[in-house]
Amino acid sequence: MIPVIELARPDAPARIDEACRTIGFFQIVGHGLDPVVEAAAWRAAQDFFALPLDDKLAVAIPPGDAYGYGPYRAERLAASLGADTPPDLKETYSIGPSDEVCASALGADPAAAFVFSSTPWPSALPELEASLRTYYDDLAALVERLMSAMAVGLGLSADHFVPAIDEHTSALRLLHYPDLVSIEAEPGQMRAGAHSDYGTVTLLRQSGPGLQVVGVDGGWHDVPVIAGAYVVNIGDALERWTNDRWRSTVHRVVIPDSAARGSRQSIAFFHNANWDAVIESVISDEAPLHPPISAGRHLMEKFLTTQ
C-alpha cells in the first residue's frame, strides 16, 4: 500500500510520481542521512520530553508565534477539516528557521512574523539547539534532493523547484505520545486527529505503529514502521503546485490496541517553500484549477483554519 523507494535508484522519480498520484505517501530508504546526527536528534527529543513540566512550559509557544512547546491535549488537528473532536493525546516541541534567517526575512516582510518567529530553547538542555539545528539543516538538504527527483517525475528540470525553496520556512517538530495504558480515551479521541499537512513535503521518523492514511478505497490503512526509513507525504501546497495531480492525503495517529499503548515518539520535518514563492500549476498541458498564490499566504490561510 505504501511503497518503499530507494532514492538513489534511476527509477525513483517515476515511482515517486506514481505514489504521489495515488496514495500521496511513500517511504524512502538510502537517503544518506548521517546516523550519528539522527541519533543525536532522537536523544535530544527524549531528553526534552523527560524534562519537568515547568521546564517545558518555560518554553511554551508564545501567543502569536509558531515555535516552542505545545502541552499535552493542547491541539485538535482535526479542526483543520472542520471536525469537532476531543484534544489530541500528544505533546510537541517545534523549532523554525534560525534567528539569523528570521531577522533577515522579517526586515523584508513584517507579515511573515508568524513563520519567522524565534524559537525558545530550554536552558536545562544547552546541547539541544546544536543537535536539532544540525538535523534541521540535514533534513532540508534531503528535501531539496527529494524535490529534484519529484521535479523529474513531473517532467520538469531537476532544479525546477530550487529557486522556490532556497529560503524555505520549514519547521521541525518533536512529538511525544505518552503512555496510554492507564488512560481511557474519550469517544473519537486520537493521538493526532485526521488532517492533511499544509506545506510542500513532510518527512517523518517514527518509533512505533499508529500512523494511518486514507487509501484510494476511502479506508484507513496502517503505515508500517521500517527501520531507517522516512515516511514522506505530500502537503497541500505541493498538491496545488501540481494542479491536484498529486494527493495531499488525510492521515491520523490512532490509539492502538492494548499491546501497543505505550509511549510513542516521532520527529516530523514540515517543509514549506520560500515565503514569497509563487505556487501556480506546473502542469503545462492542463488548465489551472487554482489561481496563483504566494506560499506564505497559502500557509497562513491554512493555519487560520485551526484558530
Where are these regions (language model features)?
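Peripheral, non-catalytic segments flanking oxidoreductase cores
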Residues: M1-Q307
